[in-house]
Amino acid sequence: MKTLSFSVDSSTFPVPISAIPSLSPVMTLMKLSGVTSLAPFRNMFHHLGFGANVTRSNLSKANEQRDPRIFEEYALKLISIAREKRTGLKDFFISNNVYAFDSTTISLCLSVFWWTKLHHGKSGVKVHTLFDVKNSIPSFAIITGAEIHDSQVMDQIPYEVDSFYIFDRAYMDTKQLYAIDKVGAFFVVREKQRMVYEVVEDKRYNNPKTGVMSDTLIKLTGQKTKKQYSKPLRRIVFYDKEKNRTFVFYTNNIEVSAEDVALLYKYRWSVELFFKWMKQHLRIKEFYGTTENAVKIQVYAAITTYCLVSIIETEMAEEMTTYEVLRVLSTSLLIKMPLRQLLSSCQEELLLENKREIINTNKYIQLEIPFDEW
């Protein structure tokens, strides 16, 4: 497996050549399509580990033979490094670790990706991701067929004691939730359908200002659910003024406030934003191979890229966003310059641009931003 390397202070991170499409999609498409506009840089190709021109068919054949587990293990290793470097960088309203778990489906054409299976008339793969909310980094990822139900992979999550796990209603599986409770972890999950239960304790708590409508301790009485989850559960009804909708949450934590439970669920959107970022800025919609191996390799390469960019952002570019760092890297792969020097000059330019925007804005309008409790 060919690699290029990025050095961040005393650490060197080898990056698979398969990650180049994520780092620089424009350059890669030109290279693969045989466009000659990169001819002046041909003597610099060795810097990227390239030899002769790479065709799409050659890359497809190579990825067909490669074992995606190598890329999976490397992605998980970079995830571990990125989480370690970002831990404690941001203040959070709760001291426990908080994770949001969800999946995103990458649609594939069944006639081309023949190994996929139909699910609701569509074929594709699912990327199931456990997202570290406090550190804005994925902590676990697994790829399955689109036909696999979300709750079926809950038993593969590496649960941590005293940590919170936030789930959407697709994960309202009482058997899996009870397994989380047995580990000593906490969950917050949205109600999927009306549950059959009896009230054990009604806290008679109602706060229209924050949206909490009720906070009760219940016991499931359904024929199946009472066997799968025999302990009391906390049920919170919350009204969201912004969306004009009522939500029902279940949790096994009885200590945090009802408002905090609702706020924790709002942070579930962080994993949705991560999926949106990945699909928008990294190449996981167009694949260079049609086999299952090729698809998995490219998805894991994209996750590797995200983690690498996050590490560089944390170590060298605190004033820049993850996307801004990605843009700099994608346009500078053929530039032989120390990363710190490259990013430092970019940060200075960004600060000047921001100052100019603030000055121009203040000339014409004075913004009043209301305090939003939520």
Name the predicted role of every residue range.
Residues 1-36, 49-52, 63-66, 70-82, ...:
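Single, function-defining residue in the core of a domain
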Residues 39:
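Alpha-helical residues within the helix-turn-helix
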Residues 42-57:
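Short, basic interhelical loop/turn and adjoining N-cap
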Residues 116-117:
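Extracellular beta-strand-rich solenoid/capping regions of secreted or surface-exposed proteins
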